[in-house]
Amino acid sequence: MKKILYKTNLGKYYLGNSEDLLRNKLNKDLKGKVQLIFTSPPFPLNQKKKYGNLKGNVYKEWFISLAEIYSELLTDNGSIVIELGNAWEPERPVQSLLPLESLLGFVNNPNAGLRLCQQFVCYNPARLPSPAQWVTVNRIRTTDSYTNVWWMSKTDYPKADNSKVLRPYSKSMKNLLKRQSYNAGKRPSQHHISEKSFLADHGGSIMPNVLEFESIDKTKEARIPENIFSISNSRSTDYFLQRCKEEGYNPHPARMQPELVSFFIEFLTEPGDLVLDPFAGSNTTGHCAEITKRKWVSIEMEKEYGMQSIFRFEDPSLRSLLKVGF
């Protein structure tokens, strides 16, 4: 029997091994119906974490095997987005190639039929200095402050619309639009810029694939798309952390940035589409999908993380019809 910990009108949170569930009991329900699989699998860390992580070739083989499971769940124009952190060789100040080898194996899995649509880099200044031995003790490496985010699909043209994730114009661009003139002509790059190339107001500028939800340059504001900012700036995260404290839970140590989840949900799906997270943890993905009126399915092995994820949906501001225990 499928173990549903809780559900809302839009989604369900399952407890169990995601590979087993998606190969068997959930396969029929989800096959060909998922528009976006967004997840952050356990990273190949050298120290064992409570939320689970494998090492070396065992990790790589396991990671590659996920591709064929996920691929058959997608709609014809669906997407897989995976956040994958960096790894280091044990007891050496040398970065491991394991994440890249795993990613290449995943994309090239002959039973999955995937291709890499685009690579993103997510800058996170809140990450602790790591690996600590080489960054803070010996001081021979710099802080690892980003993760790679890989967007894949079964088609060259998955559903996507970057006009839904435009970021606010910079002050200089706003001034240019107001002034309706700029220095046109030939550039050192040999590109010729016409007098009207940049005078149309499209409501914002196209996001780059380096995602700054906090600005790298502290003298400049982080220009987050307004619809993403409104989700990430809600009081829901504060509510979640407060409830964890009140109920004696230690919050999941590797919680997903809501801005990151929301960006890809807005970019790659529409209201009513189905979003899946096979490694849901405290269910940031399901929470962001709920806010944006997407259907969602989340799966997690650790009951403790499932229990604390309930707090996200008990937030009165969300107004979800939550049902717990089946």
Residue positions per predicted region:
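Core catalytic lobe of class I
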Residues: K2-Q308, L321
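Conserved phosphoryl-transfer catalytic core
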Residues: Y305, E314-F326
